[in-house]
């Protein structure tokens, strides 16, 4: 049995059409991930599927490929009626708990469907509804939406209906039911056809998810691609116990040890992300914040700059810890230990994705020790300590203190908590005119320590 499990089938061997196999190859998907290998055969047969999979497991492909294959068969393999192919508009709908995740899912659909003229629309809050109405007027094959905005259009947009829907996807269903979407979700389910295929994907199987499963799936096949709370084997996890007053020094030390790496740093509050990003910028690091306080356009702008390499450090709250498809994240640093240990799993899930290696480092102060102990209990392992030269760390104290002082003054001058919708001028100045500043200010450290990258 173990030998059978070790055999990795190709997408073609799983029954995926040649057009989509080529699309997978273009995306660098050489072989199916575990969730794809287990879910695709059933999904391609037309069965309802429940997939329990961790972040970064490739679950988007597990539902996008069957939908696109069914769309191809519906258009090209069905008998034409009165000389015309059936209209495949509003063929599938994917519901997502966040705007960012919806946009990422749509991007993957468009990449996979590039050769088949796929039409895809995104319906999320924070984006002009008139633009979305125009997109719906083009009769997209696939809609990716948050439940609230989708229901707004179903209620108010003239001529829009999902009566012809063939596929429904509930992605990150545990979060869909935990973020005040339950009412909108129930309204949507009452309006769409009962005769449809449904895919439900979730990180955990909660009571609410089970209830949703019973309500909207028919004889589903359950695929569990990971243990309930686990981290991938390619993730190197470490911690460092530090006094609270020295935590910033340790953070700067760690970032200086790996200057070319892409990093995500998690803080507990929105103000904390902005303050820490300001501190790091003043020390020459290319950091940018993202949090729920920012407008949608600013959040997407920050993500795009991070993806494009204009900055290599993203300072974020847990709003960014799930669902963001950011490639090549090398390091995740828990600057603030999460009070909910399950959030740790989602945070470190930003690295070591799709078979790549990655590092997760937690900075634990004396007030966070109990939370950290709960994390180790959850993942079932004791983590090794991140080795650091204490003398080198403490030598940063004066520079870090000065940077914190300047950043606090900057925050105070701009009114502390930025008003929602206000431009992040510091980000624009930093990214627009000081791209080389980090390397210049840290020049000595870069040559000295870049060779140590990931040896820890």
UniProtKB/Swiss-Prot annotation:
Its main location: nucleus. Keywords: ATP-binding, Helicase, Hydrolase, Nucleotide-binding, Nucleus, Repressor, RNA-binding, rRNA processing, Stress response. A motif (DEAD box) lies at residues 171-174. GO terms for molecular function: ATP binding; ATP hydrolysis activity; RNA binding; RNA helicase activity. ATP binds at residues 53-60. Residues 407-456 are annotated as: Disordered. It catalyses: ATP + H2O = ADP + phosphate + H(+). One of its GO terms (cellular component) is nucleolus. Residues 40-223 form the Helicase ATP-binding domain. It comes from the Eukaryota. Signal peptide: none annotated. GO terms for biological process: rRNA processing. A motif (Q motif) lies at residues 9-37. It is found in: Nucleus; Nucleus, Nucleolus. Disruption phenotype: Plants are indistinguishable from that of wild-type at 16 degrees Celsius, however they generate a weak phenotype of pointed leaves at 22 degrees Celsius which become narrower at 26 degrees Celsius. In the leaves of plants grown at 26 degrees Celsius, the xylems are located on the adaxial sides and the phloems are on the abaxial sides, similar to those in the wild type. Plants with double mutations in this protein and in AS2 or AS1 protein have abaxialized filamentous and trumpet-like leaves with loss of the adaxial domain at high temperatures. Residues 250-394 form the Helicase C-terminal domain. Residues 434-448 have a biased composition (Basic and acidic residues). PROSITE patterns: DEAD_ATP_HELICASE, HELICASE_ATP_BIND_1, HELICASE_CTER, Q_MOTIF. The keyword Oxidoreductase does not apply. The keyword Nucleus applies. Its EC number is 3.6.4.13. The Q motif is unique to and characteristic of the DEAD box family of RNA helicases and controls ATP binding and hydrolysis. Belongs to the DEAD box helicase family. DDX47/RRP3 subfamily. This is DEAD-box ATP-dependent RNA helicase 10. The lineage of its organism: Eukaryota, Viridiplantae, Streptophyta, Embryophyta, Tracheophyta.
């Amino acid at each position: 049995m173990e030998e059978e499990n070790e055999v990795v089938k190709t997408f073609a061997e799983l029954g995926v059409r040649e057009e989509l196999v080529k699309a997978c190859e273009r995306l660098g998907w050489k072989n199916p991930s575990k969730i794809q290998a287990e879910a695709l055969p059933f999904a391609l047969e037309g069965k309802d599927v429940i997939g329990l999979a961790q972040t970064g497991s490739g679950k988007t492909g597990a539902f996008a490929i069957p939908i696109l294959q069914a769309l191809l068969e519906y258009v090209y393999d069905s008998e034409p009626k009165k000389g015309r192919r059936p209209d495949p508009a509003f063929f599938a709908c994917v519901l997502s708990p966040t705007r960012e995740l919806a946009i990422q899912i749509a991007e993957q659909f468009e990449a996979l469907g590039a050769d088949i003229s796929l039409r895809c629309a995104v319906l999320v809050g924070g984006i002009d509804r008139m633009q979305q109405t125009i997109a719906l007027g083009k009769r997209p094959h696939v809609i990716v939406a948050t439940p609230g905005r989708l229901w707004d259009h179903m209620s108010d947009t003239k001529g829009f209906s999902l009566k012809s829907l063939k596929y429904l996807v509930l992605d990150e269903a545990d979060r869909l039911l935990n973020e005040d979407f339950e009412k909108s979700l129930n309204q949507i389910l009452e309006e769409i056809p009962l005769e449809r295929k449904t895919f439900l994907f979730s990180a955990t199987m909660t009571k609410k998810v089970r209830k949703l499963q019973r309500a909207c799936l028919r004889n589903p096949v359950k695929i569990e691609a990971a243990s309930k709370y686990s981290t991938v084997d390619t993730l190197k996890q470490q911690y460092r116990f530090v006094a609270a007053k020295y935590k910033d020094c340790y953070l700067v030390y760690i970032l200086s040890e790996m200057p070319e790496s892409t990093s995500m740093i998690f803080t507990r509050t929105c103000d904390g992300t902005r303050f820490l990003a300001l501190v790091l910028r003043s020390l020459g690091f290319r950091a940018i914040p993202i949090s729920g306080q920012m407008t949608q356009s600013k959040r997407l702008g920050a993500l795009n700059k991070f993806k494009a390499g204009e900055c290599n450090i993203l300072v974020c709250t847990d709003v960014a810890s799930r669902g963001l498809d950011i490639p090549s994240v090398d390091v995740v640093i828990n600057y603030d230990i999460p009070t909910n240990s399950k959030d740790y799993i989602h945070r470190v899930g930003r690295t070591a994705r799709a078979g790549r290696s990655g590092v997760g480092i937690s900075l634990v102060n004396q007030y966070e020790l109990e939370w950290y102990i709960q994390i180790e209990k959850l993942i079932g392992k004791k983590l090794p300590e991140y080795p650091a030269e204490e003398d080198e760390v403490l030598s940063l104290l004066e520079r870090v203190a000065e940077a914190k002082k300047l950043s606090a003054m900057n925050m105070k001058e701009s009114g502390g908590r930025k008003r929602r919708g206000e431009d992040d001028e510091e980000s624009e100045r930093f990214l627009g005119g000081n791209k080389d500043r980090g390397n210049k200010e840290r020049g000595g450290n870069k040559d000295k320590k870049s060779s140590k990258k990931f040896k820890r």
